[in-house]
């Protein structure tokens, strides 16, 4: 994992990011990038949404970059994780709708559209627009950013291209003092791919099914609980 060691429990000058009850009873330093990995249908996205929702409940900003589902679907599903969706300050970078050729969509306060998951330059631009807006206009000093899913990026682009994109993405989260959350289907990629990508992240949550239909979580890179 990343030698930057962003999960230092003694961050100076900036409050820590709290985690939901499902994860260790620790807080993460501003600028941390967290990878959530596991097989399909093990609840990875739910864990990621819970991390995001913990911020929404604390009046933090939330940004979702979706390469798998439309913004409409993301917003509808996220509503079940927060008490009142109308009070949530959220922005979605939709990388799906234009690719599907759905009408003449335009950016609005909650949704910005990239042309496709291949358009990593466009995705980065839309993310930067939201980050600037959330900090300077909406006045959120604390923002959580979710990328769902890294696996979709790897369907359309090679590992080197995705690695470079994520290196810039994670760096942007770090420089903005945000909390980055990234979801990947670990069974869709070989060990070399997974090990290469894990270098970019400060902490990892491995999600699995315990055999009884319940989600099991294993963590690495988190601060020690004292």
Located regions from the model:
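Phosphate-binding/switch loop-helix module in NTP-utilizing enzymes
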Residues: 99-168
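Nucleotide-state-sensitive switch-loop elements of NTP-binding domains
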Residues: 42, 78-117
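Glycine-rich P-loop/Walker A and Walker A-like loops and their local beta1-loop-alpha1 context
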Residues: 13-79
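Short, Lys/Arg-enriched N-terminal segments with co-localized hydrophobic residues
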Residues: 1-15
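Short, aromatic/basic amphipathic alpha-helical patches
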Residues: 74-84, 193-198
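Phosphate-binding/switch region of NTP-binding enzymes
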Residues: 179, 183-226
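Substrate-engagement module of ASCE P-loop NTPases
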Residues: 152, 164-188
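Short, charged/polar "capping" segments at the starts of alpha-helices
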Residues: 70-75, 100-102, 189-192
């Amino acid at each position: 994992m990343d030698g930057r060691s962003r999960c230092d429990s003694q961050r100076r000058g900036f409050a820590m990011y709290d985690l939901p009850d499902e994860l260790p009873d620790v807080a993460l330093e501003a600028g941390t990038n967290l990878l959530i990995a596991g097989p399909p249908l093990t609840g990875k996205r739910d864990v990621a949404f819970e991390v995001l929702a913990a911020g929404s409940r604390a009046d933090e900003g939330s940004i979702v970059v979706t390469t798998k589902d439309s913004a409409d679907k993301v917003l509808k599903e996220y509503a079940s994780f927060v008490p009142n969706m109308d009070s949530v300050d959220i922005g979605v970078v939709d990388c799906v709708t234009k690719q599907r050729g759905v009408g003449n969509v335009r950016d609005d306060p909650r949704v910005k559209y990239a042309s496709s998951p291949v358009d990593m330059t466009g995705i980065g631009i839309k993310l930067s627009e939201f980050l600037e807006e959330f900090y300077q206009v909406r006045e959120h000093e604390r923002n959580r950013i979710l990328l769902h899913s890294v696996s979709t990026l790897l369907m359309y682009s090679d590992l080197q291209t995705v690695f470079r994109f994520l290196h810039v993405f994670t760096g942007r989260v770090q420089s903005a003092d945000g909390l980055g959350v990234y979801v990947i289907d670990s069974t869709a990629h070989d060990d070399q791919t997974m090990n290469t990508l894990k270098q970019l992240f400060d902490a990892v949550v491995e999600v699995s099914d315990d055999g009884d239909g319940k989600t099991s979580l294993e963590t690495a890179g988190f601060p020690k609980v004292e």
